[in-house]
Amino acid sequence: MTEKEKMLAGMSYSAVDEELLSELDAVKEIIHRYNLMSPADYAGRFDLLKNLLGHIGDDEIIINQPFYCDYGKQISVGRRFFANFHFTVRDEAPVTIRDDCFIGPNVSIYTACHSTDPVERNTRREWAEPVTVGNNVWIGGSVTILPGVTIGDNVTIGAGSVVTKDIP
């Protein structure tokens, strides 16, 4: 089993695997191009996102620059999606964001997990847990969503929150 297959299966994997590092570098190049595009070039930005992300619900998607992600293909967004400036997604595991979601500035979604034991952490092994955001969710500015969290439908997350557990 490759390290990428382990990562996608939620197993412990080497974060410094050559295949994974190469894929990360390729995505960084795409993200760099996206972040340099004119903010008024909605069609061009949408086309790039269609190729980068795993799924886009419709053409009513706006992700303001700058935007950052690790792999892109693990991210699925529903219809009528909006993310403000500095949206960061560490998508080592699937990140599913359903319909009619609004994300404030400086929001981060993390799926990668690291050991709290420094000796183990220094081996550069990690694992990942998926994040799911339901329909009609508003996530306020500067929110951090940690690995393994599910946020239910019709939820508002207040600005500055750190979401560590599921919210029904």
Label each region the model flagged:
Residues 164-168:
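Short, intrinsically disordered, charge-balanced linker/junction segments flanking boundaries
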Residues 138, 156, 162:
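Short-chain dehydrogenase/reductase
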Residues 59-61, 98:
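Short cysteine-rich loop/turn motifs with clustered Cys
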Residues 4-5, 53, 123, 130, ...:
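Short secondary-structure boundary/capping segments
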Residues 67-77, 82-150:
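Flexible, glycine/small-residue-enriched loop-and-beta-strand segment within the central core
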Residues 1-59:
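Terminal amphipathic alpha-helical/low-complexity segments used for targeting or macromolecular assembly
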